[in-house]
C-alpha cells in the first residue's frame, strides 16, 4: 500500500515538474530561407558547384574521346604502345575520380566552402535562438525542420517569427 501511494505521489509530482518546463518550436529551414545572406551564400555555392561540375564534365568528355580514339587505333598499335595508351587512360580515369572526390567528396572543397559561407549565418541564427531562450526562459527549443520528427506542433508554440525579429528580418 505504501509503495502504491508513493508511486502515485511521485507521478503526481512528476506531472508538475513536466508542466513547469517551457519549450518552443522553431523551423530553422524557414528562418534561413528568409535571410538574404543565406540566399546569397546558397547562390554562391551553386555557382561554384556548377563551375566544378563543368570542369569534371569537360575532363570526362576528354577521357571519353581518348577511349574512342584508343578503340579505333587499338588494332594498329604495337603491344608496347597499346600498354602505354592503356596506362594513360587508367591514369586519366584515376585523376578524374580524384578530382570528383576532391571537389564533392566528404570534407571536399564544396563541404569546406559551405562551412566558410553558411556556418557564420547558422551561428548567427543559433545565437538569436539562444538569446530568445534566455529572454523567455525556455527550457527546450525544438527544431522541426529536419533533425527531429514533430508529428504535431501547436502553431502558437512556433517561435520562428520571433527569431527572425531578433535577427532584424520583418
Regions found by a protein language model. Name each.
Residues 1-23:
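Bacterial Sec-dependent N-terminal signal peptides
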Residues 21-170:
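Amphipathic, charged alpha-helical segments and their helix-to-coil junctions
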Amino acid at each position: 500500500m505504501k509503495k502504491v501511494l508513493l508511486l502515485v505521489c511521485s507521478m503526481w509530482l512528476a506531472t508538475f515538474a513536466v508542466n513547469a518546463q517551457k519549450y518552443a518550436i522553431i523551423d530553422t529551414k524557414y528562418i534561413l530561407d528568409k535571410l538574404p545572406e543565406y540566399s546569397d551564400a546558397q547562390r554562391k555555392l551553386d555557382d561554384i558547384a556548377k563551375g566544378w561540375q563543368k570542369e569534371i564534365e569537360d575532363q570526362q568528355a576528354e577521357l571519353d574521346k581518348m577511349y574512342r580514339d584508343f578503340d579505333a587505333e587499338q588494332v594498329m598499335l604495337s603491344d608496347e604502345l597499346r600498354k602505354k595508351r592503356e596506362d594513360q587512360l587508367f591514369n586519366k580515369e584515376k585523376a578524374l575520380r580524384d578530382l570528383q572526390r576532391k571537389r564533392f567528396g566528404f570534407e571536399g572543397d564544396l563541404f569546406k566552402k559551405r562551412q566558410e559561407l553558411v556556418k557564420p549565418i547558422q551561428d548567427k541564427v543559433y545565437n538569436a535562438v539562444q538569446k530568445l531562450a534566455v529572454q523567455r526562459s525556455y527550457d527546450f527549443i525544438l527544431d522541426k525542420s529536419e533533425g527531429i520528427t514533430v508529428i504535431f506542433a501547436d502553431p502558437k508554440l512556433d517561435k520562428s517569427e520571433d527569431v527572425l525579429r531578433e535577427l532584424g528580418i520583418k
